[in-house]
Design a protein with these regions (language model features):
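RNase H-like, Mg2+-dependent phosphodiesterase core
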Residues: 1-198
């Protein structure tokens, strides 16, 4: 992983390039999170990689390192009600836009993980598997995942029967069994449960 995507954007004349990624599109419960991160070009952060390939402990450590070293960052989310109202894709776009809007300093070019460009106030590009190719996107994936995981741990205390601390809302066997036994709670995505609960 290197800064080639960021570097290309700077060569085009852009002055502030950030990476944006999401966490939590697939779970049956809880919000979808996104983060936007503007790193100093060339900054080396050991072990920076796609958040899904890192242990929870490593992600937590990198979360602080990224926030301390970023030129600017922003975190945003869309909750389960918004996901049910506008669908998960649009809710993900909303979370990404909120993350961008929450940055301490504005960027003028965005690198988005995936193959679909959300509506953004500035130009940018999509990068498939960007969280494994761009340090800015990798950093964003970590901020988004850790932020969402922390929220799900709080929900685990509120709704202990679902064991959100174990699966963070994903459709594991334990989670699906709890849904059949107890039914959904207020943070479940109703549109995601139709196939499971009928």
């Amino acid at each position: 992983m290197d800064y080639s995507f960021e570097h290309e954007a700077y060569l085009k004349g852009y002055t502030a390039v950030c990476g944006i990624d999401e966490a939590g599109r697939g779970p049956l419960a809880g919000p979808v999170y996104a983060a936007a991160v503007w790193l100093p070009e060339g900054l080396v952060i050991d072990s920076l990689n796609d958040s899904k390939k890192l242990s929870e402990k490593k992600r937590e450590a990198l979360f602080d390192v990224i926030k301390e070293n970023a030129v600017a960052y922003g975190i945003g989310f869309a909750d389960e009600k918004e996901i049910d109202e506008i669908n998960i894709l649009q809710a993900t776009y909303l979370a990404m836009r909120r993350a961008y809007d929450n940055m301490q300093k504005a960027c003028d070019y965005v690198l988005i993980d995936g193959n679909r460009m959300p509506p953004m106030p500035v130009p940018g590009e999509t990068i498939v598997k960007g969280d494994a190719k761009s340090p800015s996107i990798a950093a964003a994936s970590i901020l988004a995942k850790v932020s969402r995981d922390r929220v799900m741990l709080e929900y685990a205390k509120q709704y202990p029967v679902y064991h959100f601390e174990k699966h963070k809302g994903y459709g594991t066997k334990v989670h699906v069994e709890a849904l059949h036994e107890f039914g959904p709670c207020p943070i479940h995505r109703k549109t995601f449960l139709k196939k499971i609960l009928g």
